[in-house]
Amino acid sequence: MSEESFDDTNKAFENEKDIILEKIVKDENNLNNCSNMINMDDVENMKKELYVLHKKDEEIENNVDCFSGDKYNVENVINLKKKKKKDEDTDSSYYKTTLDEVYDTSDISTDEMLSNYSSSEDNNNIEMNIINDFYLKDDNTYCLEWNSDIINVLSEEIKEKEKLLEDENKDICNMKSRFLKLEKYVNIKKKKIINIKKNIEEKRKIEFDEKEIFKCLQIKNDFLKKENKKIELEREKNNKKIIETQNNITTCQKNIDDIKKELILKENELNDFINKIKIIQQEEYEIEKIKLSKDKEIQNVSYNLEKYNNEKIQQDKKYEQVKMNNMKFDIELKSIIQEYYDIKKDIKNISNKYICIMDMIKCRDKTIYKFEKDYTKTIHKEKQLQNKCLHKQNLINTQKDKNIILNNQIKKIQFDINKIRKELNDKQMSYDKTIIDRDHLNKEYEYEIVEIKEKLQEEKKSLENTLQHLNETYITMSTNYEESKNEYEKEQVNNIEKNDLIKSSEQILVQLQNKLQKLLDEIKSLDLEKFQLTQTLQVIKNDYITLEADVLGTQIKIKQIKSNIKKTEKELERQKEMLYKFDFQTQVLTKKINMISGISTFEKKKENQKKIILLEKELYKNEDIYNTLNNEMKRINIEIKNIKLYQNELQEQKMNYKNLYEKLQLEIKSLESTINNEIKEKENIMLIELNLKIELDKLKSTFSKHVDNLNICKKEKKENMNNAKLSEQDINAHMESLKVIIKNINDEIHKLNIQLYEKKNKSNNLQLKLNSIIICNQKNKDQKDICPNENQHIYYKMKIDQDIINLKEQLKKINEQIDKENIETKNFQRTLDDIIQTNKEFNDNIKSIDPQYKILLKKKNKLNKKWEQINDHINNLETNINDYNKKIKEGDSQLNNIQLQCENIEQKINKIKESNLKVENNINDLFIKIERASNQLKKNLAPTTNMMKLKNKQIKDDENNLSNNNNNNNNNNNNINVNVNVNCEPVPLEKHIFKQIQMESLKEKLSLLMECFKNNIDNVIMKEVFNLIETAE
């Protein structure tokens, strides 16, 4: 029977081992599933519990070995009893102190405890009979050693143990009540933790949104980098285009220089032609002398000359047209040269603007370089922080090791239950106080929210008042604007004021760019602060996760402790049953002993002694079991104390984290409220800014249009002035040419009149009639020549008057446009002043806000303005680049037009060259023919002198006159040559043109002579001369 009981105990302990091992496996699975949510301390505690159970098994086996011996002495039994009494005394004193300090006492009695075990008495009686049968078979040698005193001692010990069991039952009931309370507390904490988890999930969502925003920022930064690269490529392309335009300009300059050189060469050629023409005139003069010597021949010649004069007038008109075309070409050359200089000026302006763009790009590159430096600094700081974190982690690990050592020491030390309970009460009081403080804080937070809303409403009202004031100011400004219009119509604003306004606007733009750079720097600082806040939030989250893991570990430990307590309760109930059975058997034995004492039979005594020995063995066994259970209870109590200490520490940590969490919640709510308010303000500001931007864009567009119109008007004005000057020059040149033509005509008429008067004396009546007819015809022709010239003068005067009237009208239009543009510039300046005033008022309103919210407002405004300014800057760069591309295209088109004009001029010059070559060839042919004719005339006239003796006198007289005239002409020619040598200065174009006209008149005269020869072939001399000319041809 003893072996079966030992097997039962071993099975019980083995079952406990299996249960604990299963729990360990489950815990390990939970660890893997929960992703390190449970600490390693729980696993270590479980291992320690296994170690304790192994020790218990070893102790039980040792005790079994002691009892399993066939023989043992009574002295050893007595010594064991004494030791047990001492242990029980110490245990009883310990339990008494604990029971006195328990708050709640249980009303459960021993009868109620035994009522549950009435059904198991029959089984116990059967077992006792089996035990008696077993022990009666043993030797009866040891039964004589027992006495009645030992039995009495055993009965007393049994009674004392019953009392101790009752006390332990009360303690167990109290412990149950306490654990129920702890379960309720743990459930409440679970609910709170669930709420905290929900809040954390909300925060995670917010953080996810922030990460998305950060990604968007990164994408925009990448986009800006790409655009910078594109701008650099466009800049290189623009540089190439500028170099090409410069090369084209140099080629144009070279072409113009070549044209000038060609013109100089042509002037020299014209001078050579003029000298040749003078020689031809001299020879012509000699020929005319020969004509005068022959009266009869001159009659026919004079008639033909009249025809020649008519043809000459027509050819003069044609020549004048050619001359006018040449003048137009000269004017076009001048206009092209002026356009070339204007293009140079535009190129200079473009180069200056390009330099400005390069400066802007350099500034931007500098800012990027600064950003890179700041980025390297931040990376260095991050490395330092990582090193610090590693150092702190090492310190934390060392502290954990120390904490483990301290925990082991604390487990060895036995804390008093009174102190623990007092601390629990104090902590409960503190927890209640914290709840009350939390309620107060929530109320204060709501009160502050209400105050903030009231302040925001007041600020809104103030802003509305400012808007009303601005509307009033706008109305007043509009009235002032109308007054200024009236004043401006009276007074003309100088162009200097416009330039000043433009300069002021440029200075404002420069200031805005500087502000933009400052705002970018501030945005960087805000980004760093945001990064630090995110890091702190991550640290807090990690701490909270560790707390949750600790709470789960404590809950698991509590469950394990509850299961252990239930097992101990079951074992205690079994022990009580055994003790009651033992008491019943002792009573039966006492009765039998009394019967034996009355009967005094020896055999019955032996039997009773055997039974007593068996009962004592069972008693020892039960006592050993009882001691082991007591030791387990003590160990469990110690573990419970340690658990309570650990729970207190966890509660303290939880309270601290709760406080931190509540503070963070308050801060987050305050930030959310401020952010919402700031978002509303931001939206209002954005609307205002959008309206202002739209107005600014409109003003800029109108301003640019007016500037373009001004430039166009200025160009038109210059062109009109140049055209007027050119028209005046054309008129003056035309007048001078007409005067010279009239003088030449009058001289020729005078000469012809002299010749006619000389011929009248010599000629007959027929000649007089012819002369009279000729004179009448000449007068009519002179009147006809004068009339068209006068009509031409009147026509040119009318044209000049019309041009002057048109120019005046254009000047009036230009002045009106200038006035409008000045008015619009004033309006633009007024709008800028209004914007500056609104900004000042807005800054004053911000200053009136509490200092606690100023920092948040600044941060918010900086973050909001950051992207707007960057986008504005990018848009401005794009617009500037597009403008420069347009201007470059315009310059290219202008250069192409200039090249086409140059090509047209070159073609015209080539045509003129060809015509000049043809004229030269014709003139050379005529000179050759005239020389041949003169030589043959001299040869033919020499033998005919004898045939004309009657006419020698007249010829001599004529020769004398001719000799005198030749001397005079020679003197004149010598003087002319001297003047030419002295005055080697270049002859003007007008004189060259008049000389060309004279040359054409000579050609016409020669053609008339040829006709005269053909008409007067009857004359012998004329026949001979004509034959000579034909042979020469």
Curated annotation (Swiss-Prot):
Coiled coil: 212-326, 405-582, 615-771, 797-1019
Keyword annotations from UniProtKB, A to Z: Coiled coil, Merozoite
Keyword Coiled coil assigned: yes
Coiled coil is among the record's keywords: yes
Biotech relevance: Possible candidate for an effective malaria vaccine as determined by epitope response in sera.
GO terms (BP aspect): cilium movement; cilium-dependent cell motility; inner dynein arm assembly
Source species of the chain: Plasmodium falciparum (isolate 3D7)
Record protein name field: Uncharacterized protein MAL8P1.12
GO CC terms of this entry: axoneme; cytoplasm
